[in-house]
Structures are given as structure tokens and as C-alpha cells.
Amino acid sequence: MADTSECQSDKTVKEEPFQSVKTRKRRKNDKEEEMDTVESRARPSFPPVKAQKLAGGKSETRKIPVPSHRYTPLKENWMKIFTPVVEHLKLQIRFNLGSRHVEIRASKETSDIGAVQKAADFVQAFILGFEVEDALALIRLDDLFLESFEIADVKPLKGDHLSRAIGRVAGKGGKTKFTIENVTKTRIVLAETKIHILGSFQNIKIARTAICNLILGSPPSKVYGNMRAVASRSAERF
């Protein structure tokens, strides 16, 4: 009888399967994997919110006044302005003949929140006197800005003194202006006593300093030297 009981106990020992004991780290990893799979299944997908919905259902608008001397250039280049605003930014644009304003409005297809402001900056740059190709950079790039100031803001000049200051900034045949543009990678418009600069923040700062020095009476050669030194330093920094 004792032998039979021993045999039965041996059988039960042999029949019991071997159970692998998991370490704490492994158990934790398994739990994390299970949680990830559950989260991925239950994770909702939210489509991007339309710009019109963010504005509370109202379509955002901008109105840019057009001075009389820019009517003809606007008419000649209208398709170059119209195409990127409508096709690329998905906005609505028109020229109001009654109020003499370019009106820009968001549509149902507009997805970018800042599209209306980009288009307004683009049109404003053209109205100020920049070429359409240069102004288009305001739509394509995010880190470009427009800055405007008057010569009187730098130094109160009148008569011939003012004319000479404008001449120093422009240079013979526009040479000085082109040099500043090429070195600082900006675009400059001289509109009577107003100066408009288009470019990145750092480059506008360098160009503005050079123009201010010319207005204050510094010789062009000295201004070129200082400007190139500052531009090379900023290029090395970035």
C-alpha cells in the first residue's frame, strides 16, 4: 500500500506543469504594452478646425486702402495678386471701386488661421511699392516683416537738406540702395520721405542702421564697411 501511495504522489508531481515566474520589470512592461494597445484603439482623431469656426462662425475680413497713384499698378498686376491669395490661401479677394479698398475675406475652405493676415501683409507690401515677386515672400515665409519709417523720424530735415539725404540713401542710379539690399538680404522702397523695408527681423535692423547713418551724414564707404562687418557676424552666428 505504501508503494502504491508513493507511486501516485510521484505521478502528481510529474503531471504538475512548470510555471515561469515573471519579474516585476517584465510584468510592468507587459502592462504598459496592454495600456498602449487600449489607448491606440480608443484614441479619437480630431480634424483641424476651420479658420471660420475659430472666429465664431464669422468670416474674418481685412480692408487695405489703395492710394490713387497705385491704381494702375494694381490693375496691371491684379491676376498676380489674385492667384496666390485665392488658390494658395483659399481666401476671397476683391477691389471695391466705391471705397477704393482691397477687401480680403476668409471662406469655408480656409484652413490656415493666419491666412487673412498673410494676404493683407502681401497686398499692403505691393501697395507700398514692392514688386509682386518680392511681396509674395510674405505668404511663403513666416519670419518676414515690413517696417516703415520717415526720414524726419531720424533727423528733422527740410528743403535741399532733405533732398540730399534721400539722394545719399538712393545713391547714383540706385547703387547705394541696391548694395544695402544685397548685403542685408532685404528689399527697400524709397517713397518720397518714407522708407519701407521688407525682410527678416535681424536683416531689417542692419539695413535700418545703415540707412539712418546715411541720413545723419556718414560717408557711404564707412557705412558699407560697418554694414558688411555686422552682416558677416550675424551670418556666422546663425
Curated annotation (Swiss-Prot):
Biological processes per GO annotation: ribosomal small subunit biogenesis
MF annotations from Gene Ontology: RNA binding
Residue ranges, compositional bias (Basic and acidic residues): 8-17
InterPro entries, A to Z: KH-I_PNO1_first (IPR055212), KH_dom (IPR004087), KH_dom_type_1_sf (IPR036612), KH_PNO1_2nd (IPR055211)
Limits of the KH domain: 159-211
SMART domains: KH
Coiled-coil residues: none
Keyword Iron-sulfur on entry: no
GO cellular component: nucleolus; nucleus; small-subunit processome
Region of interest: Disordered: 1-65
Chief subcellular location: nucleus
Subunit structure: Part of the small subunit (SSU) processome, composed of more than 70 proteins and the RNA chaperone small nucleolar RNA (snoRNA) U3.
Task performed by this protein: Part of the small subunit (SSU) processome, first precursor of the small eukaryotic ribosomal subunit. During the assembly of the SSU processome in the nucleolus, many ribosome biogenesis factors, an RNA chaperone and ribosomal proteins associate with the nascent pre-rRNA and work in concert to generate RNA folding, modifications, rearrangements and cleavage as well as targeted degradation of pre-ribosomal RNA by the RNA exosome. Positively regulates dimethylation of two adjacent adenosines in the loop of a conserved hairpin near the 3'-end of 18S rRNA.
PANTHER family listed in its UniProt record: RIBONUCLEASE Y (PTHR12826), RNA-BINDING PROTEIN PNO1 (PTHR12826:SF13)
UniProt similarity note: Belongs to the PNO1 family.
Name of the protein described by the UniProt record: RNA-binding protein pno1
The organism of origin for this protein: Nematostella vectensis
